[in-house]
Amino acid sequence: MRNKIIKGLVSVFLILGIFCCSKKEEKKSEEKVIKMGFVPLKNSEQLVEDVKPIADYLSQKMGVKVEAFTASNYIGVVEGIGSGSVDFGIIPPFSAVLAQKQSNAQPLLTSKGKTGKSGYTAELYVRKDSGIKSLEDVKGKKVAFVDPSSSSGYIYPGAMLVKAGINLDKDISYQFSGGHDKSLQLLLNKDVDVIATFDGVEERYAKDFPAALTDIEKLASSDTIPGIMVTASSKMDKDLQEKLKQALLDMDKDPKMKELFTKMFSITGFEEVDQTAYNKVEETAKVMNVDLDKVK
């Protein structure tokens, strides 16, 4: 009799143990968090708050919690994607190319701009009262770039200056501001003479810097830069990658999401990646003597 009781208790404990383990595994699955990375286009805390509706939308579509992450600089997102601490990034093309080159990150989608086509341009902006009318006039001036890994904030506009015969280390003095909004502020405050940024920066930050709509003008435009890319860490689950792709491809069917992407990133939708377009990014980096394997 005693043996039967003991065996019965053992069975109960085994069942309870299996049940508890099952619950723990279920809870673990429910608590899985996917990190979505962004470069610091603006104040990091504010950006994370602004993109929360995007994270919520993707959470619903993918069936897993998605949280936004903004690094303090551009390379921080690239490194996060490489290590797997960031599962995917919605990042500029040069950052995407770096991630592919350095950690075999997977290009999933590219963005469509307001024209419905992929791509955008970098611009050099000056104040209207600066007297700077040509690229040659930039010699001897103060220039604000955004980040060494920024496509529109350094690589492409820097290449424009180099092609115009300007030695960046000898003919100008320059700094990296850390953000497009910060560069704009430097220009408006007359702390620099020229800034490198993206087309439409004055409209994007008009709320914070209304003078940008009246006091600055474009000096020069770059060749077309491939669109912002959705890039997944090689460590991200393949099924989740497919769910992410489908959710973003369906985004333009959701008016609120489309409006938010357009307002924040000038993105009207996503499409499959044409990898050949990104070869141009590498070519432009070579003009700047940038070794993709050594960028840190």
Question: Predicted segment positions?
Answer:
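Extracytoplasmic small-molecule ligand-binding "clamshell" domains
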Residues: K27-V97
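Pocket-lining segment of extracytoplasmic ligand-binding domains
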Residues: S130, K141-D239, Q246
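Bacterial N-terminal signal peptides that target proteins for export
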Residues: M1-L9
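C-terminal motif of bacterial Sec signal peptides marking the signal peptidase cleavage site
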Residues: G17-C20
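An extracytoplasmic/periplasmic, membrane-proximal ligand-sensing/linker region
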Residues: E31-P53, I225, T231-K296
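A local structural motif
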Residues: Q60-T70, S85, V162-S177, L213-D215, ...
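Short helices/loops that flank or line small-molecule/ion binding pockets
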Residues: I75-G89, Q102, E136-D137, H180-G200
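Acidic, polar ligand-binding/catalytic clefts
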Residues: E79-D137
